[in-house]
Amino acid sequence: MKMKLTNLLHEFPELKLGSLPSGKNPDSVPIEYIQSDSRKTNPEDIFCVPESIGTKKGEFISNTKASVILLHRSSNISIDSSKIVLECEEDPEQLQGRIASFLLGHPSKTLEIVAVTGTNGKTSLTNILFALAKDQGKICGLIGTIGVKFGDRSIDTGYTTPDASSLNLILKQMKDEGVTTVFMEASSHGLKLGRIGGISLKAGVFTNLTQDHLDFHSDMEDYFESKFRLFEILDVSKSPFAVLDYSSPGGNELHRKIRNNLPDLPIKALDGIGGEYKVSNPFLTLQGTSYVLSLPGNRSQTISTNLLGSFNVRNTALAFLTGLGLGLDPKGMFSSLKEIPQIPGRFQIVYSKDRSRMAVVDYAHTPDALENIIRSVRNSRPKRLITLFGCGGDRDKTKRPKMARIAEELSDQVILTSDNPRSEKPEAILDEIQSGFSPGFTPLLREVDRARAISEGVGILPEGGCLLVAGKGHEEYQIIGKEKRHFSDVEEVRKAFGLF
């Protein structure tokens, strides 16, 4: 039997009827689902009107097919009298996930869901966890920046963390197709906007906290609080646990906050003071990475992986700790870590035909990520390291000069180009980046056309040299103005090397 509006009002007392058309009765109004995208609504849906859309509320409400409108009680908007209006005291987006979960029969309740948050490393860590669990027979799902993956399906959602309605629908699909374990990225946007509300989580994993998204968050404290929110919403009925990198930026502070506010939540901390899990003796090459991980009982294990870069020492160690919490076999994990499938756009190497030169494509688009990838590439001792990067338009502008300083200090030469300029003028973005260079420093090339910049960068690369192409990684598009064009760093590098 289809859900009725009266069932919803009973389940969520915070919802109040703002208006009910004459002749309508909550007992007879069918409710199919809830959506915050007016384009996805059907007549029996609820259109959730987020506060974040501001002055466009009226426009979206007039375009929706939904018969029920949910909005903040302070909204002063004229609504067609044929619509049913529901009101609430909080931002409706914060309720959306719980309502979506209720309407779908709480699909996440029977799933083992691990959410990973942090400025950098979310995509790599969730992909590593997916591989480890799958190798041990678990039927897994993956949700994140690269898309959604389960069974033979691969879906591009366009978001690191999909909106709450889409997320619950994805989880229901996964559950219906036999998935038992899900690894998902939890972005700070998703956490602050309530996209994970109503999701029953088994574990939360924290990688690090460095500057990003200050165009969205008021300051770093607000950014941190959004990350902490993940651990507050873990499902206590699932014996939840937390995993964090104590030595990473923000790790110490998060550990302390969890201890003070969530004293019953078990924590597995990497490199914590007095902790049982510590990393030592990392050895990095272009063939792979190895390190020693200390374990409880004065034991240790050398871990080897095909993944490259110092950051993957942290990622694989955190994945191992998370796997322990999920009951995965340690020996099986040690074996699986040796051959993790290439994560698209993460330290992805492309060699020239004769392998005398190489390019590294990486998603690094924050100061910390750029520094980490340049240092990791440096470990391969290229004869010359040229770093090519830009910064996204309509995003945090304060990181632009910082990334310039990092590129100048750690690279032999620098090429400036466009990332996703969006509504900003590409040359203006490059001006702001270039303001971070020291007096007298001039980039090797300044070219807003990213394809041309990559081609010229490869063209001047000497034998034994490396071109680091940073910022877009796996992305297969470039946003210029309002237009989303096909574009792939990997494709452009391969073209420049004459590989196709």
Swiss-Prot record:
Which residues does the record give as ATP binding sites? G118, T119, N120, G121, K122, T123, S124
Per the UniProt record, which EC number(s) apply here? 6.3.2.13
- InterPro entries, sorted: Mur-like_cat_sf, Mur_ligase_C, Mur_ligase_C_dom_sf, Mur_ligase_cen, UDP-N-AcMur-Glu-dNH2Pim_ligase
Catalytic activity annotated for this protein? Answer: UDP-N-acetyl-alpha-D-muramoyl-L-alanyl-D-glutamate + meso-2,6-diaminopimelate + ATP = UDP-N-acetyl-alpha-D-muramoyl-L-alanyl-gamma-D-glutamyl-meso-2,6-diaminopimelate + ADP + phosphate + H(+)
Residues given in the record as meso-2,6-diaminopimelate binding sites? R395, D419, N420, P421, R422, G471, E475
A single Gene Ontology CC annotation of this entry is: cytoplasm
Q: How is it modified after translation?
A: Carboxylation is probably crucial for Mg(2+) binding and, consequently, for the gamma-phosphate positioning of ATP.
Q: In which pathway does it act?
A: Cell wall biogenesis; peptidoglycan biosynthesis
The cofactor(s) it depends on are: Mg(2+)
Q: Which GO terms describe its biological process?
A: cell division; cell wall organization; peptidoglycan biosynthetic process; regulation of cell shape
Per UniProt, the short sequence motif Meso-diaminopimelate recognition motif occupies residue numbers 419-422
The residues listed in the UniProt record as binding UDP-N-acetyl-alpha-D-muramoyl-L-alanyl-D-glutamate, with positions renumbered to this chain, are: S38, T160, T161, S187, R195
GO MF entries: ATP binding; magnesium ion binding; UDP-N-acetylmuramoylalanyl-D-glutamate-2,6-diaminopimelate ligase activity
Residues modified as N6-carboxylysine are: K227
Q: Provide the top EC class.
A: ligase
Cite the SUPFAM superfamilies for this sequence.
MurD-like peptide ligases, catalytic domain, MurD-like peptide ligases, peptide-binding domain
Where in the cell is the protein located?
Cytoplasm
Job of this protein: Catalyzes the addition of meso-diaminopimelic acid to the nucleotide precursor UDP-N-acetylmuramoyl-L-alanyl-D-glutamate (UMAG) in the biosynthesis of bacterial cell-wall peptidoglycan.
Which protein family is it in? Belongs to the MurCDEF family. MurE subfamily.
Q: What is this protein called?
A: UDP-N-acetylmuramoyl-L-alanyl-D-glutamate--2,6-diaminopimelate ligase
